[in-house]
């Protein structure tokens, strides 16, 4: 006889199912489960008197016969492709199955076999996302990495050599010597890493040698001189060696205007950093480049979202990061030219329309490395409050908006930088970089961070307590963040030409590594749920932004979710 159970009782036991709705933390964002693959009445769950026991939900099969290393039971997946309830199987550090876990000898529809070799993570009541990708990192200090991991970021791409003056301002690891040292340093960190070389050179040989030394991309930055000639040279090398180019354009318009930069790019694929312009770029109209089909536009998080405090904090940040002197009027004028209320307000709306594709941090260089995910969903919340439901959504849920915004920090930066074969989504075959969130803490404090199939970070109580939960409970690094466990669970991303040249062997790298691929034939249309290409115009006098003739403006937020309610500091 089938047994009927109330939705509330079912959700409390196995987590929410199809049709159930969840409020995300203290935002106004509502998620609704679209599908459930766990089979009612045949769910697996670990614990005393529960299902995953020998001869019941646990099979007699061996690992060699298909048993997974880890099963995450009854997980609610939020990804660009859907919002579904499912079990997740992990084997050899990769996602091996999404669907129904258990024992095929006693249960039907099992595609994830649980056995004696299987560890269990309870996903009931948790939301699972792919580990976030921060594609705008200034590697100023190594402590950034723990802070990023604690927030749910598992991949960091950028440049730098430490707190050098150049690194404080630009995301470049210049030259083979510094690239080699950073690749060797990466061996000790429990996240995926990749480093950008300096792209500011008209001599192509100076750029090629950096890519062949191990750079996974090149960065053009105005502080090194982003001239049309440098842009053309850098993109030519990138096309030859299949790496992405990131650009911070010429705020002062010394070498040309935004139209000249677009002309120099010549339709080639490029990732434009902080495309609104407060972080740097042609003043006042770099934002119009987000309508170009070959441009992948991103934001950095200090302007996410537009608040009462956004403008005030930017001036001092800018002066420090770009080595400017407040006693020099020209330096102050340079800084002030980048900070515009009108373009920052428009940036909010362009994200909601899917015209801006990526959000990153700009870590310690006008951005906060631990706030990529929280700022993303603060923006989503603000836009729901100010603009209402998206046309693709309804009064029951914000599913399309949630999928659009999660894509900005997961799959889209992965595609942009040629690493989507390995990371960026919860899909079979990809590295098991997964973040588990309790709904009340979604976007602000992960419960667990799984890195390459092993727990790298978790909320953990007093180590001297008799159980794991006594206070003080806070995020702490776990076993796979230490020792040689880092090597098989984390990837270092290199150019394919560097791998062919034997860089990992020459530098005696022990970490797993992978090449970046297919960065040059992608376009704005490759961006999941964020491929809108409106025609952008900026009034040169008022700085008002228009998309397809419509004025884009919104008020600054006075109060935000995912903020002081959750944080003591």
From Swiss-Prot:
UniProt keyword annotation of Hydrolase present: yes
One BP term from GO: urea catabolic process
Catalytic site positions: 322
E.C. numbers: 3.5.1.5
Positions bearing N6-carboxylysine: 219
Cofactor(s) named in the record: Ni cation
Cell compartments where the protein resides: Cytoplasm
InterPro entries: Amidohydro-rel, Metal-dep_hydrolase_composite, Metal_Hydrolase, Urease_alpha_N_dom, Urease_alpha_subunit, Urease_AS, Urease_asu, Urease_asu_c
Cofactor note: Binds 2 nickel ions per subunit.
Residue ranges occupied by any Urease domain in the UniProt entry: 131-569
Pfam families documented for this protein: Amidohydro_1 (PF01979), Urease_alpha (PF00449)
Sequence positions that bind Ni(2+) 2: 219, 248, 274
GO molecular-function term, one example from the UniProt record: urease activity
PTM (free text): Carboxylation allows a single lysine to coordinate two nickel ions.
The protein's annotated pathway: Nitrogen metabolism; urea degradation; CO(2) and NH(3) from urea (urease route): step 1/1
Residues reported to bind Ni(2+) 1: 136, 138, 219, 362
UniProt keyword list: Cytoplasm, Hydrolase, Metal-binding, Nickel
Main location: cytoplasm
Disulfide bond sites: none
Catalytic activity entry: urea + 2 H2O + H(+) = hydrogencarbonate + 2 NH4(+)
Residues reported to bind substrate: 221
Subunit structure comment from the entry: Heterotrimer of UreA (gamma), UreB (beta) and UreC (alpha) subunits. Three heterotrimers associate to form the active enzyme.
Homology family: Belongs to the metallo-dependent hydrolases superfamily. Urease alpha subunit family.
NCBIfam families: PRK13206.1, PRK13207.1, urease_alph
Protein name, per record: Urease subunit alpha
Biological source species: Prochlorococcus marinus (strain NATL2A)
Gene that encodes the chain: ureC
